């Protein structure tokens, strides 16, 4: 359903390409989902679509398709905040899975978002911490680009990190007040570290790639966990 191949040569998501790919794929994807569910379009009793946040071009494609389908079938149209959707996905009925009890804290982490959310009820949510610059996914992708790992770099760094020593190298964690995050400084620190070490030893990356990835991931996870622990204390 989803592919990053159209963005790989650019080292990141290109909004125009993303919206075009979305436009090409949305009809066959919906058709496939309906067939897999063993129903027809006439069995639908509502259309939920992502209103935001996200890339404007892709959001417009989804909105236009959803409105057209709902109008054609004469069924309700339901706007969804996709970050709320991530949190509420935990309430889908799954055998053997215990649903969260309100209130609880949720952390949403992706290529474009990093948030800590206090969830009091299904539609009572408050963002109590978020990134003031770059998201976690961007930190992974930019680090991967510096290391020559390609895009998307997150899965590659995660895989290599399992083979390395997370305490081999130390990167300074950004100091941000409250529950907010910042990853731009970490990206810069990693870039300067790699430039410095490869100047002294050209094969530094190749010889230490597992340890570098492990150290980067260890630092990022610690930043997230420190803020989450602080959020737990402040919301008890």
Please provide the spans of the model-predicted regions.
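A contiguous, well-structured pocket-lining segment that forms one wall/lid of small-molecule binding clefts
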Residues: 158-236
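Glycine-rich phosphate-binding loop plus the immediately following alpha-helix
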Residues: 120-165, 187-188, 192-198
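N-terminal beta-alpha supersecondary unit
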Residues: 1-53, 82, 86
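Nucleotide and nucleotide-moiety/phosphate-recognizing core
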Residues: 40-43, 65-82, 89-91
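Short beta-strand segments
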Residues: 48-50, 81, 105-110, 117
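Short Gly/Thr/Asp-enriched flexible loops that form oxyanion-binding sites at enzyme active sites
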Residues: 49-73, 92-93
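Conserved phosphate-binding catalytic cores of ATP/NTP-utilizing and phosphoryl-transfer enzymes
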Residues: 80-104
